[in-house]
Curated annotation (Swiss-Prot):
Cofactor note: Binds 2 magnesium or manganese ions per subunit.
Record-given protein name: Glutathione biosynthesis bifunctional protein GshAB
Keyword ATP-binding: yes
SUPFAM superfamilies documented for this protein: Glutamine synthetase/guanido kinase, Glutathione synthetase ATP-binding domain-like
Enzyme Commission designation: 6.3.2.2, 6.3.2.3
Binding sites annotated in the UniProt record for Mn(2+) 1: D695, E716
Regions crossing the membrane: none
Catalyzed reactions: L-cysteine + L-glutamate + ATP = gamma-L-glutamyl-L-cysteine + ADP + phosphate + H(+); gamma-L-glutamyl-L-cysteine + glycine + ATP = glutathione + ADP + phosphate + H(+)
Entries under Gene3D superfamilies matching the protein: 3.30.590.20, ATP-grasp fold, B domain
Name of the top EC class for this enzyme: ligase
Positions contributing to Mg(2+) 2 binding: E716, N718
Alphabetical UniProt keywords: ATP-binding, Glutathione biosynthesis, Ligase, Magnesium, Manganese, Metal-binding, Multifunctional enzyme, Nucleotide-binding
InterPro entries given in the database record: ATP-grasp (IPR011761), Gln_synth/guanido_kin_cat_dom (IPR014746), Glu_cys_ligase (IPR007370), Glut_biosynth (IPR006335), Glut_cys_ligase (IPR006334), GshAB_ATP-grasp (IPR040657)
Amino acid sequence: MTLNQLLQKLEATSPILQANFGIERESLRVDRQGQLVHTPHPSCLGARSFHPYIQTDFCEFQMELITPVAKSTTEARRFLGAITDVAGRSIATDEVLWPLSMPPRLKAEEIQVAQLENDFERHYRNYLAEKYGTKLQAISGIHYNMELGKDLVEALFQESDQTDMIAFKNALYLKLAQNYLRYRWVITYLFGASPIAEQGFFDQEVPEPMRSFRNSDHGYVNKEEIQVSFVSLEDYVSAIETYIEQGDLIAEKEFYSAVRFRGQKVNRSFLDKGITYLEFRNFDLNPFERIGISQTTMDTVHLLILAFLWLDSPENVDQALAQGHALNEKIALSHPLEPLPSEAKTQDIVTALDQLVQHFGLGDYHQDLVKQVKAAFADPNQTLSAQLLPYIKDKSLAEFALNKALAYHDYDWTAHYALKGYEEMELSTQMLLFDAIQKGIHFEILDEQDQFLKLWHQDHVEYVKNGNMTSKDNYVVPLAMANKTVTKKILADAGFPVPSGDEFTSLEEGLAYYPLIKDKQIVVKPKSTNFGLGISIFQEPASLDNYQKALEIAFAEDTSVLVEEFIPGTEYRFFILDGRCEAVLLRVAANVIGDGKHTIRELVAQKNANPLRGRDHRSPLEIIELGDIEQLMLAQQGYTPDDILPEGKKVNLRRNSNISTGGDSIDVTETMDSSYQELAAAMATSMGAWACGVDLIIPDETQIATKENPHCTCIELNFNPSMYMHTYCAEGPGQAITTKILDKLFPEIVAGQT
């Protein structure tokens, strides 16, 4: 079967860039002095027996981060960024991830084999340590996984003379593997980033700096007698099987090639079931990137892989691959500033890249990537290894690496309430995703704008919307809670205290009600909104003008409005999950405190500069507005936004204390009497709610609550209650909620970890 010139036959509009990607990144855990740590793999990261994203490689201190399959290089890096964020915040606070492929100074006896549950995996690692030595096992890197797109493969298949898709794909990936190994020196030259080994790593003197220790024969390679042919897939499979039968290899995965066929559990299955994708294993960690690989590297490699497919297969495969290995070794061992040797035929690569880009009409971005490759071929200063040279001090990169590691650690802990790369999603959803990754629960974002997730563990699948809307809630429950009239009736029928009031469907009806409430404290609010939108509170009798404004604000949010009695006391939010109170929050209304110098408008701007404040529930605290509601509140207190407040004078900008309207959060879970927590849970249960926010007004929290004498009033139940405000509070310890959501959804994971 010949595949030469097949790519050239495709239409220019063919989906040439269609592919699936995955990244595996290895990194060592070190302390803040750059020394290897001897702590076990973090227990908060769940069980390594099933964790899909965070594993240990050879050493107990060597983390392996694994992305799910992504449809683009950008999404693959986004996955890796999030997993790196989780890993960085799951290790001990005095630990960081080493950003280099080559380890810091170490002794062989320091290296502890990963303490895995699987007997074979432990035995396998002990075998490797005995055979290859332990120091080499501490070398880390990046594995770049790629599957050609389904439509692209189908288009190539249609252009071929083949009738068997599995055989065709096998031939396609075999050709790609052959040319990748033939030209692997290109990867080493451009992206090699392990120019030195720290003192004591090798027993003998090794010339340095070089382009890549890891990608030379000084790195992690098989014994010289292991020679596997890539002439055919059958030859490849049979050779490895023979080495295992002879005892030269213990398992198929002990064959360490720069490229590995993937998609089946055993190699022989490739012959009848087919190769699914390729794993390219010869990438050094890029220490200039927090996640170890840049976007331009990902996309340049993608182009190079397609160029290898564009090029013809070698006529003599074994000879071409042997020459490619020798050339790679020469380039890996050469000084980072040494030009490419004459036998490195860069023109073949450049021509293939140019023709590929031209044939498929790729845009400026990909054209610029090709220009960068050409420039690096001409000038080794532009290669990654050369860029590391200025940071070598006394034949060591330890100081540079530690500074980078600490900087990346600090970045992980910046805005630690968010999940890196997913900041545009709701904060509660980000927190749930963080915990899902940490626990080892598979995830897929079904609709990012709608905050809709698919979570699964083995065959157990759960769908989650907005952080806590799940199959555990009956469909009608959130509909009932969205309707405040229905909520009040259900609670009242169950014997729980609710405020009295009336409902109106027009401004005229509401205004006609004014004579009945003109001398009363009242609350005006929309019938069916959440997050405190459109609510006005009058602790003093409202004038007709202010009452009308409050009605207009409420009607702007809904077609029906409630006017209720104002209940004096302190408002608390109780978070109820599955019949149990998990958190209690005191919310202080949006406010500013004067300094005698600045206007209220300026004080609001100062308070909004707090990095914890943001918009759309993506930060623990919300931006304070100066809209109609806030200005009405100021007017009731005799102020305008441009007035200067006296020093120490506190002015509230809202009557309602919702965090979503700029309030402050104070965690009082540990001090709130359990009787109120139990009463709030009973209210949620009466609604049939699984996850529910219960808002209680409590005049005196020292009084013990009972159903007969509740000493409180329920002013609202909230479906899809915010979780972040309970965890990241303005004051108090905070309560983790999202992890409890996951524990309830996947109790088998909790059971498996105890």
